[in-house]
A protein has these predicted regions:
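Acyl-donor-binding surface of acyltransferase catalytic domains
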Residues: 1-10, 87-88, 100-184, 339-341
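Short amphipathic alpha-helix that is part of the acyltransferase structural core
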Residues: 2-56, 175-214
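Conserved donor-binding loop and adjoining core beta-sheet/short helix segment
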Residues: 18-19, 30-136, 248-267
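Residue-level recognition of the GNAT/N-acetyltransferase active site
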Residues: 95, 99, 103, 131, ...
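Conserved acetyl-CoA-binding loop-helix of GNAT-fold acetyltransferases
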Residues: 104-118, 272-275, 281-298, 322-327
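Active-site/acyl-donor-binding loops of N-acyltransferases
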Residues: 145-170, 290-294, 303-345
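Extended hydrophobic-aromatic, low-complexity segments
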Residues: 199, 245-251, 259-267, 279-283, ...
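Phosphate-binding active sites in nucleotide-utilizing proteins
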Residues: 204-256
Length: 345
């Protein structure tokens, strides 16, 4: 990480910094990110961004993320995180946000341009995530318009789909799951620590062409299984009866902590569903998905409140998965878009 440097932008009172990463700074960033998410109803920063920042704090990494801030005294007015490319073949990822009180003044645009300049000639290797437009019929939010204004064009669309839960839906999901049986050679079980390496192998194979999921490392896995939301009883694995290390398929659920109460919260998430390429074509994905849905239908948050909804994310071009989730009652709630410099979708 670069040493702290400061310059005062000519048109604002904000100070731009790229501070050395510390635990105190990460706490400040988390507070900023939570406040933005509370205001906007969607997080501007992905789970992977938070994980990469934590990893960089805990251990020395060859390609640490870069965190740029626009500060007003002790207040973070805007933040820009660049996840550095790990190889010549990979691209980097940018996520950024402006605090609500500082929007509409041009401060975000000036800061974004400054941060991109700090990336130098490598800036063209980065793609920008913009989270949470209302639907997929156009660019509806200032953030999406902002991306376009700065020469970025959409190259990937990710749907957040939601299934509200009521008693009828809960019963239906449980009945559907009970009606599905695994092949005779497989058994359903839940995750244990002994599954780390077998799971990583199957995950990499199942998501060989996925830009994020297929690249999960042991450190990434342990970061997630060590988090406060992880529940092994919600991580389902279909494996050979005679060989637990032979994983045919899996589905992982997530119930985030500290969600509060609302019409659709607390919510649980179908975090990831994967099928070993050697086992594809037999309906295992649907069977494991239904098992996870039945689990979430009867689950509660950390305070004992039953879940009000189930969420999941799916790429817009994954028509098979989209059709499956639509058939199960899910509908698109918001849309995330990834942008690249000078490209069109």
């Amino acid at each position: 990480m670069m040493a702290t440097s400061q310059t005062t932008p000519p048109s604002t009172d904000l100070v731009y910094t790229e501070p050395a990463l510390t635990a105190e700074l990460l706490d400040r960033f988390d507070t900023f990110a939570r406040e933005v998410a509370l205001h906007d109803g969607v997080s501007a920063f992905s789970e992977q961004t938070r994980i990469e920042l934590t990893k960089a704090l805990r251990e020395r990494t060859l390609t640490p993320p870069r965190l740029f801030l626009a500060e007003d005294g002790g207040t973070i007015a805007a933040a820009f995180v660049a996840l550095t490319p790990v190889s010549d073949e990979d691209g980097g990822v940018i996520e950024a946000a402006v605090a609500p009180a500082y929007r509409g003044r041009g401060a975000g645009s000036a800061f974004f341009e400054h941060a991109v300049r700090q990336l130098g000639k490598d800036a063209v290797r980065y793609r920008l995530w913009v989270h949470g437009s209302a639907n997929d019929t156009g660019i509806e939010t200032p953030a999406h318009a902002f991306a376009t204004l700065h020469g970025f064009s959409p190259v990937r669309v990710l749907y957040k789909m939601v299934l509200p839960l009521d008693e009828s839906t809960r019963e239906d999901l449980v009945e559907r799951s009970d009606a599905r049986a695994l092949p005779e050679n497989l058994r359903m079980r839940t995750y244990t620590g002994a599954d780390e390496f077998p799971w990583l192998r199957v995950n990499a194979a199942a998501f060989a062409h996925h830009p994020e999921q297929g690249k999960l490392t042991l450190a990434d896995l342990r970061e997630r299984t060590g988090s406060d939301w992880f529940r092994p009883e919600g991580f389902f694995i279909a494996s050979e009866k005679e060989d637990d290390a032979s994983i045919a398929a899996f589905t992982w659920t997530k119930i985030p902590t500290g969600q509060g109460r609302g019409e659709l919260s607390p919510a649980g998430e179908i975090y990831v569903v994967g099928v070993n390429p050697d086992s594809q074509g037999g309906g295992l994905g649907r069977t494991l998905t239904l098992r996870a849905l039945a689990y979430l239908a009867l689950a509660a948050d950390e305070s004992g409140e039953p879940l009000h909804a189930i969420e999941l994310y799916v790429d817009a071009d994954n028509t098979a998965a989209y059709s499956l989730y639509t058939s199960l009652g899910f509908s698109v709630a918001t849309v995330d878009r990834m942008y690249a410099p000078g490209h069109a979708a």
